[in-house]
Amino acid sequence: DAKAVIIYGQEGDNTSNMRMEGYEKACTEAGVEVLAKLSGNNLTDGATKAMEDLLSAYPDQIDIVLCHNDDTAIGAMNACKSAGVSDITIVGFDGNASAVKLILDGELVKATVAQQPYEMGYQVVEAAVKAVKLEPVDEVINAPVQVVTAENGQAYLDNLEAMKG
């Protein structure tokens, strides 16, 4: 069975807490054991330190590193490379171009989960118009995400560039 560690954002942050709950539930459903969770404080350097600590605590045991954002994924990758660890899969979140480029270069960051800001903005305006018209507005509005990997990374980057105009 696969074993994972989670490098999360900041203690007490609602978004970070909800993301953590989702990661843990998905791991449980997939039969992945979560060995530990450490904060990277949403920073590359913080995640590098967290990953160094995790590699020390769990030598040769970590298969997957789940990160709450792409900066922490890059920090985790830096720590793994410094320690000579290459048989590990790191997953980020946000779909930053820098992380996608690492994925395309075959680095340890293998995927990132990209939010869809255009769709999110569109749905916010739709909800605002409904509210102004005194129509019912959904309490929760879910926006899609896209998993970006080596297979679709270049198309994702091309789309990002096209959206810049």
Each predicted region: which residue ranges?
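A conserved helix-loop-strand patch within extracytoplasmic ligand-binding domains
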Residues: 1-5
